[in-house]
Protein backbone atom coordinates (compact mmCIF):
# COMPACT_ATOMS: atom_id res chain seq x y z
CA UNK A 1 0.00 0.00 0.00
CA UNK A 2 1.35 3.41 -0.94
CA UNK A 3 1.66 6.04 1.78
CA UNK A 4 0.43 8.74 -0.59
CA UNK A 5 -3.22 8.76 -1.68
CA UNK A 6 -3.88 7.84 -5.32
CA UNK A 7 -4.61 11.14 -7.11
CA UNK A 8 -5.15 11.54 -10.82
CA UNK A 9 -2.53 13.76 -12.47
CA UNK A 10 -3.98 16.83 -14.14
From Swiss-Prot:
Gene Ontology CC: mitochondrial inner membrane
Localisation per UniProt entry: Mitochondrion inner membrane
One Gene Ontology term from the biological process aspect of the record: oxidative phosphorylation
Record key words, sorted: Membrane, Mitochondrion, Mitochondrion inner membrane
Bilayer disposition of the protein: Single-pass membrane protein
Pathway info: Energy metabolism; oxidative phosphorylation
Tissue: Heart specific isoform.
Subunit structure: Component of the cytochrome c oxidase (complex IV, CIV), a multisubunit enzyme composed of 14 subunits. The complex is composed of a catalytic core of 3 subunits MT-CO1, MT-CO2 and MT-CO3, encoded in the mitochondrial DNA, and 11 supernumerary subunits COX4I, COX5A, COX5B, COX6A, COX6B, COX6C, COX7A, COX7B, COX7C, COX8 and NDUFA4, which are encoded in the nuclear genome.
Family: Belongs to the cytochrome c oxidase VIII family.
Function comment: Component of the cytochrome c oxidase, the last enzyme in the mitochondrial electron transport chain which drives oxidative phosphorylation. The respiratory chain contains 3 multisubunit complexes succinate dehydrogenase (complex II, CII), ubiquinol-cytochrome c oxidoreductase (cytochrome b-c1 complex, complex III, CIII) and cytochrome c oxidase (complex IV, CIV), that cooperate to transfer electrons derived from NADH and succinate to molecular oxygen, creating an electrochemical gradient over the inner membrane that drives transmembrane transport and the ATP synthase.
Protein name, per record: Cytochrome c oxidase subunit 8B, mitochondrial
Taxonomic path: Eukaryota, Metazoa, Chordata, Craniata, Vertebrata
Amino acid sequence: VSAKPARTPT
